[in-house]
């Protein structure tokens, strides 16, 4: 197989013959290992170009990892439940991973609130970062685990994701966050009632719990300061995320990618969450906020600060992400040598 320069530095896939040899070549041009991939003709091999290497991902076309000749209940169930549409599979992947992420994040936030540690920035940064790490591991092999509508939209804007996929991913992310909010609320229902009673929304009070679900600014924060905070945080997040994803840059190994993203979120959150919570993720804020409105927190979750807050952590992460994406492209992305990919990513039969 001849050299194939990846057209997309973030998620290039090659449909190849199942009996092929993939040469792993590191950034120095050396060839440390060779790997032959052989499997059933019903399977597809996708070569995913990452930082200096080609990784093989096997996807079963109709047996979901089970032998066609088997006819036990597991094989029958797998064949019945398997979804042919890759687009649908990716949407389900994003939805489940977002549910996983938000379940961990909201559960940790609730525990911090109940134990009086809600104002500990290190603790909040820790559970934000590690929640996203494990969530990306859930979906990384299927959809990439973007888990952020603002970043998803930006990647589509940069031409690295189709607009149809963008719409499906974003819908799945909002949906997963909403369902996670409902589940965590039901799990902690008795604790919430015991802790807050009728005083749910008052974030200045001792027993308010609205801050478990959504972000709220400091009372002194101006409208201008709140907007700039959301834009700047998400801009930094996006620049860091794109640099981690770009195989032409110092991208971490595939298994370390979620950890790198989690450390990035942890650092940005720790640096800039004091004033307004550093949502950086529209689905992380608006989906739980909508759930709290439904279950009786009242319209104060939207009317807080005379309706001069709820739309800020929802709208301006999109602005910050777009700004970060454009900045990364202008300063880094467009300046790689055109033949860079050919020098470092090679397929051979």
Curated annotation (Swiss-Prot):
* InterPro entries assigned to the protein according to its UniProt record, in alphabetical order: Aquaporin-like, Aquaporin_3, MIP, MIP/Aquaporin
UniProt motif NPA 1: location:
148-150
Q: List residues traversing the bilayer.
A: 92-112, 125-147, 167-187, 225-245, 256-276, 314-334
Protein origin, superkingdom: Eukaryota
Q: Which GO terms describe its molecular function?
A: glycerol channel activity; water channel activity
* Name this polypeptide is given: Aquaporin-4
Query: Under what conditions is it induced?
Result: Most abundant aquaporin in early embryonic state, adult active, and adult anhydrobiotic state. Expression is slightly up-regulated in early embryonic state.
Specify the glycosylation sites in chain numbering. 194, 207
Described by its record, this protein's role is as follows: Aquaglyceroporin that may modulate the water content and osmolytes during anhydrobiosis.
| Intracellular or extracellular location(s) | Cell membrane
Keyword Zinc included in the entry's annotation: no
Write out the domain note. Answer: Aquaporins contain two tandem repeats each containing three membrane-spanning domains and a pore-forming loop with the signature motif Asn-Pro-Ala (NPA).
In what way does this protein cross or attach to the membrane?
A: Multi-pass membrane protein
State which gene encodes it: AQP4
> Which keywords annotate this record?
Cell membrane, Glycoprotein, Membrane, Repeat, Stress response, Transmembrane, Transmembrane helix, Transport
Q: Which family does it belong to?
A: Belongs to the MIP/aquaporin (TC 1.A.8) family.
* Motif interval(s): NPA 2: 281-283
Q: Name one GO cellular component term.
A: plasma membrane
